[in-house]
Amino acid sequence: MGDEDWEAEINPHMSSYVPIFEKDRYSSGENGDNFNRTPTSSSEMDDGPSRRDHFMKSGFASGRNFGNRDAGESNKRDNTSTMGGFGVGKSFGNRGFSNSKFEDGDSSGFWRESSNDCEDNPTRNRGFSKRGGYRDGNNSEASGPSRRGGRSSFRGCRGGFGLGSPNNDLDPDECMQRTGGLFGSRRPALSGTGNGDTSQSRSGSGSERGGYKGLNEEVITGSGKNSWKSEAEGGESSDTQGPKVTYIPPPPPEDEDSIFAHYQTGISFDKYDTILVEVSGHDAPPAILTFEEANLCQTLNNNIAKAGYTKLTPVQKYSIPIILAGRDLMACAQTGSGKTAAFLLPILAHMMHDGITASCFKELQEPECIIVAPTRELVNQIYLEARKFSFGTCVRAVVIYGGTQLGHSIRQIVQGCNILCATPGRLMDIIGKEKIGLKQIKYLVLDEADRMLDMGFGPEMKKLISCPGMPSKEQRQTLMFSATFPEEIQRLAAEFLKSNYLFVAVGQVGGACRDVQQTVLQVGQFSKREKLVEILRNIGDERTMVFVETKKKADFIATFLCQEKISTTSIHGDREQREREQALGDFRCGKCPVLVATSVAARGLDIENVQHVINFDLPSTIDEYVHRIGRTGRCGNTGRAISFFDLESDNHLAQPLVKVLTDAQQDVPAWLEEIAFSTYIPGFSGSTRGNVFASVDTRKGKSSLNTAGFSSSQAPNPVDDESWD
């Protein structure tokens, strides 16, 4: 491939051999200390003849300590020979460059900080700095006891030489230290602060902490074995691995105008009345036509009016009475059709009528409703909707998601939690720490349920319903919503839903919204950038989302467009949560009218006035295509989707793409039809009419399409998948 071969995701490189270094039995001091005694006299800092005595006393000549980062990272560099870097009697990869002395008689092997650890102390601290060389640890950047040692590390492995976490507000459960700057292991570690307090020292991998920027790998030692754990394999799902997350998201605005801010429906909103809806299952309650027929309480009706809701969408007309009747539901409706309000309003109505159990006065919070979604951005969006509809009531909604400080999530919960909106990883962390009880759960909602049940999140969802205290499916109400429900996902859903659940299919089930004008262009891999710039220059400042397949390419294309003087930002799973929120904020406010995104932004995100979606790379599945173009043409507004079709890599999508275009009454290029009819896909019916993606109730046996080969149930392997949680 040429220099534009960006098709493959960058997989973590596996180390062929990771040595395990055991403590050298010869490195112990005379008195049985874990480390040798360090002279405390300041006169011994001289570079005169006494240095030879230092080597003799330290005993490190034959027992170098490879890859150990000691708990205290604040030594004053009183002994330059034992702590100075490389060479005889020095430790390789030692992150214990600290500003305190070993106390005589202490055999613990931990460093004790001295009281004179301050900015104006003239004693040098030569922690390795950033990309190499020595750095004065008494620099203002490392002043005070919270900055331990010099900043740095090798930009390759976690740890290395340098900075421990400057933040001491840790959970007790997380007090594990990564020892072994270059060849790491995990062991408990305490850092004495001089007053009996303990804190944690952790290695970092971000650019400021000297870690490798881009390849988030860490070596974890367990039962004498080393194993690589990467973020793509679930690194974000546990807060005890990797660098400590300190990000606390800013609270949303509390004024009423901001809470009820909404955008106007489009000219096509009235067309929703003509969309066909099919309900399958026994004894389905009749649909409602207005909000008044739902018999909601006055507070809810007031909030609905403030939010600008005047008419029910088709999915709301049928879903609200079904949920009010206490039935389990699987609802499939096109993107941007009001599915969030369809489950929030009846749940809130029940809670207002029956009363709530959780409050800020209870030690253990037991929410009545848990809403789970695959991405942080989507779950935060659901929370804002829940906060809007519950405004002025006793119901309190809380949102928790990965990439933020775990302590912040816990503090939000203990203030009272009736509706918990969460991503799977953070939810299981909170449950594992016993910060919430599940006995009062009445409603379990899976938004983007097809993604929640596939191989990406399916195991975690099964763990959730198997947790101690979680009511069985017969004792709770389970609701699933998505724009696509492949047949395989419906089979998996049987473990979560009662046998008499109802299935609501709205409009062209699993199909693209007809308010989106779809265009497919035949563009070769090496012509895509030029074509993209041409389209964006013609679009001007209209809000545009550009979808690519890999995280690396997202940053590359965003940088390329900025060089072309097109204001662009990017969002993907490798970006820090702070950066992801900043990117969305810049896109929403118009500062950057172009957002380059991977699948993180393809699901559920509701951004106002997105006029264009460009598929720079077509996705691997047709369901993902439907979700991507659904970012435009929402709530009756019109939009445009342009897709680049590469003959070398996208032929497998030709047949389903022709079907999607035909069902949405879009023009199908002749060249695409020719490819579609010349390409054989096992199980594909070839019909351009009828239901699509098997997103009809499989209990009826009506499916006319076997999606083998391109259904969303064949999700990417978790190793290659993006970190959504």
UniProtKB/Swiss-Prot annotation:
This is Probable ATP-dependent RNA helicase DDX4. ATP-dependent RNA helicase required during spermatogenesis to repress transposable elements and preventing their mobilization, which is essential for the germline integrity. Acts via the piRNA metabolic process, which mediates the repression of transposable elements during meiosis by forming complexes composed of piRNAs and Piwi proteins and governs the methylation and subsequent repression of transposons. Involved in the secondary piRNAs metabolic process, the production of piRNAs in fetal male germ cells through a ping-pong amplification cycle. It is found in: Cytoplasm; Cytoplasm, Perinuclear region. Residues 143-156, 196-206 have a biased composition (Low complexity). A motif (Q motif) lies at residues 289-317. Keywords: ATP-binding, Cytoplasm, Developmental protein, Differentiation, Helicase, Hydrolase, Meiosis, Nucleotide-binding, Phosphoprotein, Repeat, RNA-mediated gene silencing, Spermatogenesis. It comes from Macaca fascicularis. The keyword Translocase does not apply. InterPro entries: DEAD/DEAH_box_helicase_dom, Helicase_ATP-bd, Helicase_C-like, P-loop_NTPase, RNA-helicase_DEAD-box_CS, RNA_helicase_DEAD_Q_motif.
